A protein has these predicted regions:
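Hydrophobic, proline/glycine-rich low-complexity stretches
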Residues: 1-72, 202, 211-249
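Long, hydrophobic/aromatic-enriched structural stretches that serve as scaffold segments
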Residues: 56-57, 62-95
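Alpha-helical membrane-targeting segments
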Residues: 66-81, 103-127, 274, 328-368
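Internal, well-folded beta-alpha domain core
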Residues: 87-249
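Local sequence-structure signature of Cys/Sec-based thiol-disulfide redox active-site neighborhoods
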Residues: 250-278
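Flexible coil/turn and secondary-structure edge motifs
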Residues: 256, 266, 280, 364-365, ...
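A short beta-strand-loop structural module common to alpha/beta enzyme folds
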Residues: 281-289
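Thiol/selenol-based redox catalytic cores and closely related redox-interacting motifs
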Residues: 290-376
Length: 376
């Protein structure tokens, strides 16, 4: 595996914030079947388009080893950072960004299976199993729910190591650098940065596959995948899960959304603009605008029910005083120094101050006949 992370092959830029996790994906067997798109659709959240190659939808079954999984600021931990994983995935896209959607992620890791579903909405489930090499073959096996969902087989690697050719089916299946999930009532996207896949052709002997059969995708030959590949793996950086709905094509652009029905909005945007640091990448929208409404409707319900100040920063949603305080991060250094101090004010006091401003803003700032809050 290569240690450096290249960017020249990426179909879109990675977020300009620090990645959250480092990990290695090792000893992967990729098995693929074509599936009936209508039988696949109920398993894919609304808002995602099932991606196809020459009119065909695919699912992939991938047993492999997760190695050295750790926060980007920490070291690999024995007994926690290495474990076998077995996932079933399909291929989707949203707003032109192709990615992967997981139907299930089976892993022999209590930490991952408890943390990932709650934090990211990823469908991790604890399963016993292994991925190990015996002689010249890779052996893999998983079992969940007292053997109700099982997978077992072997992989024999054949051929030379290659990379996917442009426009090929292998490029469609392998070269994806984002994942999608549905979490807390909203569609989320996560970015994954790794070098281009190197793989070999392979053949497998599947002896059990009730894991895939459970999804009732209409696969006739459940023990005979149509395509089989093997890869020694890649080193991976993953980024925090963010709101999948975006305004515009710049994934690194943040947005401040305000109600737009009083002069306060325009004054606030003007105040920020005059004091913005050169590297700030912040746009503005009134809440009533079409693209702002699109974002608000995509937010978790606890956010979308409130007409308030929203800040979409690094794909995360903040509102009311939490949004206002974070606006300091876009400003010059002598304003940013107030950022940690503002958090010392207790939340109840901040909420009272926010409600007072919201209640009397029309008396202090006369409501204009036409919204002057600029769109940028």
């Amino acid at each position: 595996m290569e240690d450096d992370f290249r960017v020249d092959h990426l179909p879109f830029p990675m977020p300009n914030r620090r990645h959250t996790l480092d990990q290695d994906w090792r000893f992967l067997t990729f098995m693929h079947w074509r599936v009936d798109i209508e039988k696949l659709r109920p398993h894919v959240p609304e808002g995602l388009e099932i991606d196809t190659f020459e009119g065909n939808a695919y699912i992939g079954l991938v047993p492999f080893m997760m190695k050295h999984v750790r926060p980007s600021w920490f070291v690999s931990t024995p007994g926690v950072s290495n474990f076998p994983e077995f996932n079933i995935r399909t291929y989707v896209k949203k707003d032109g960004i192709a990615g992967v959607f997981f139907l299930t992620l089976e892993a022999k890791s209590l930490v991952t299976c408890n943390f990932a579903p709650r934090t990211y909405g990823l469908p991790y489930r604890y399963a016993s199993g292994y991925v190990k090499k015996i002689g010249e073959q890779w052996n893999w096996k998983s079992s969940r729910n007292k053997g109700q969902f099982r997978l077992a087989g072997t992989t024999e690697v054949i051929g030379q190591e290659v990379q996917a050719e442009s426009g090929s089916l292998e490029e469609f299946l392998f070269e994806r650098y984002s994942l999608y999930t549905s979490h807390k009532g909203s569609l989320r996207r996560g970015y994954t940065h790794h070098n281009k896949w190197k793989f070999q052709h392979a053949k497998v002997e599947l002896t059990e596959n009730s894991l895939t059969e459970n999804f009732n995708l209409g696969i006739d030959e459940i023990l005979t995948p149509e395509l089989v590949h093997y890869s020694n793996g890649v080193r991976v950086r993953t980024y925090s899960i963010e709101l999948a709905e975006r305004i515009g094509s710049d994934i690194n652009r943040d947005f401040l959304l305000l109600d737009g029905d009083c002069g306060l909005c325009h004054r606030l945007a003007t105040f920020l603009d005059k004091r913005m640091k050169p590297s700030a990448n912040l746009g503005y929208r009134p809440n009533s605008s079409k693209d702002a409404q699109m974002l608000i409707q995509a937010m978790p319900k606890k956010y979308s029910e409130s007409d308030t100040v929203y800040l979409i920063r690094d794909g995360q949603v903040y509102m009311r005083s939490s949004a206002a305080i974070r606006c300091l991060l876009y400003m010059k250094w002598y304003y940013r120094m107030w950022y940690p101090i503002c958090w010392l004010v207790p939340l109840p006091i901040r909420d009272i101050a926010y409600r007072i401003v919201a209640k009397y803003r029309h008396k202090v700032f006369k409501k204009p006949k036409v919204c002057t809050f600029r769109v940028d």
